[in-house]
């Protein structure tokens, strides 16, 4: 295992059924003014909103609501949230929802007291946060992003056709997160499986890099096997607690920075997928699904040993009588079968991607250097063309 690193994660997790009962003891650590952030209103239908608000009122909190956070939070919405937070001098931002809601809460937490344009400072120039940060807590209702235990925050600027993710330091991580697997039971299937693939993609982005014997790779193989097993159960039985709890826990560990330690990481699938999202506003997990197979088939020759290992250790491909390339190809074929089994979108046209967009999407994709192949913009266009053939 190469490299030197420090590992620390400041987020306190409460995991399991009825874990919302721990919210009052966390609320007691913060001041009176709480900004309650949530999405389109599903939490009002399933009773979570009522339960959270009651605990806030019982705790003597003054609640300022910021509803309507969209699946790909926009810059305009961020400015609105900053205004609410600053005008009301909120002491805590409580995000109740999925990854987009938690991402948005973190964006508001660092941006509300920014003296210049936070988009320019924190998302374009990637400057360090040097202003007051409002603490964030999270009540998770949808799995996928891992935002409940990391500093990640993705914001979309439609005017610039840009969707940019910023990974802030541990001072922006949620102070606490509450994870009750039963809150995920009623999620529509499309959103559920998109979240499952978001989890898988987070792991693969960190797995397909490096050539050393790295403990992190063994951890990721175990997470992938558990995810494949449990997701197959969950799509058949959405209220299977064991499966949904396993998936919720995998999602957290996939992106809480642990498995990236000692590794370079890739993230090109996310760069291309986020650029697709900036043009189409498509569901994030589905953009990753559409890009993944063409991308991995493109880079496979440059990381053949790892793709062979992936096939054998994750998909149980039998190596006998096969070349290394055939083994690697069989692994990606098994992954494709699994993706089709779940009903994931593999064709970009289903997401609103058309030939006229490809150059723009490629130009909007940041080029990273942590994987097995540093792409050119022309290669990204070719990968995007393959997504339209699936």
Please annotate each region the language model reported.
Residues 1-92:
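ATP/NTP phosphate-donor binding region
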Residues 90-106, 141-147, 279:
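Glycine/serine-rich anion-binding loops at beta->alpha junctions
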Residues 52, 80-82, 101-115, 149-152:
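Short Gly/Thr/Asp-enriched flexible loops that form oxyanion-binding sites at enzyme active sites
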Residues 171, 314, 318-390:
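C-terminal charged capping/lid subdomain of soluble metabolic enzymes
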Residues 20-23, 44-48, 75-78, 100-105, ...:
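Short glycine/serine/threonine-rich phosphate/pyrophosphate-binding segments
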Residues 206-334:
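Active-site segments that bind and position negatively charged phosphate/pyrophosphate groups
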Residues 11, 114-212, 309:
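A glycine/threonine-rich phosphate-anchoring loop and its flanking beta-alpha core
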